[in-house]
Amino acid sequence: MALIEREMPVNRVAEILGVNPQRVWTVFNHWIEKARQSDDVSTITRLGVDETSSKKGHKYVTLGVDLDASRVIHVCEGKGKATLKNIKEHLEKKGVPEDQVTQLSMDLSASFIAGATTYFPDAEITFDRFHVVKLLNEAMDKVRKDERKEHDELKGHKYTFLKNRQNLSDKKEKSLAEMIQLYPTLGEAYRLKVLFNDLWEMPDKPAACAFLTEWCNEVEAAKISAFMTFAKTVKAHWSGIVHFVESHITNGILEGINSKVQLAKRRARGYRNIHNFINMIYFLCGKMKFDYPLYFT
């Protein structure tokens, strides 16, 4: 365990110890399961849910994260509605009733939404703003690509339109100013993109709803197809988007956790089943207490 803590892949640990990797996994899994049994999740009220793949193009696992403690409390196979049931059942086994979870943060996945409303009916959903902005940026880039078909000079300027303006170099800033003047549709799309992000600074829900209503009206007037599609998505997920201005929760914490999940993939290289991978996630992201020999705090 001490060697694995030093960011060493399990296969390398087995090589150093002169044992079969499966023996290392057996010992590793024993201590993870023991720590899981005593893991205290009694204070959780705000839950984040996100999925990641165990390998590129392979099986998915869903992470349940305590957003206040910034740690993974449960991992299960799959990425659909049933994963929310799995998380709920884990919490209930730990003595946490479903109504203790008052806030849920997730992407706009229909299966996650179905799971949340079924298994955590008392929780208010906040759709992760970073996922919403990702969809907005995809709409912006779709407009650029459509314009690029007739204007080659727009090639290579994806991030000129996606980055925050203050983060552009002087050269890119000049190019942006020129392009939004030369191409009115692109300029209007960029204006709408920048304007949308004012939503996150609204003081309360009524203000957010009024702002978003006006923004959707402007999109309708602009008649830019990609933005009309995005606005349709916004309307379909309205309450969970505007709820951000009250909850201020995101899955941003999961970005840091996901970097550790990538590390888990490297350390678990050669794992024979998804159970080993899941336990490596607990080890790196669960902030659990272990009492194995030579464990240092």
Predicted regions located by residue number:
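Acidic-residue sensor for enzyme active/binding pockets
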Residues: 51, 147, 255
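Short, surface-exposed amphipathic charged segments that create phosphate/polyanion-binding patches used
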Residues: 62, 137-148
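Acidic/histidine-rich catalytic cores and adjacent linkers
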Residues: 56-58, 66-70, 77, 85, ...
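Short, positively charged, Gly/Tyr-enriched micro-motifs
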Residues: 1-58, 99, 111, 241-242
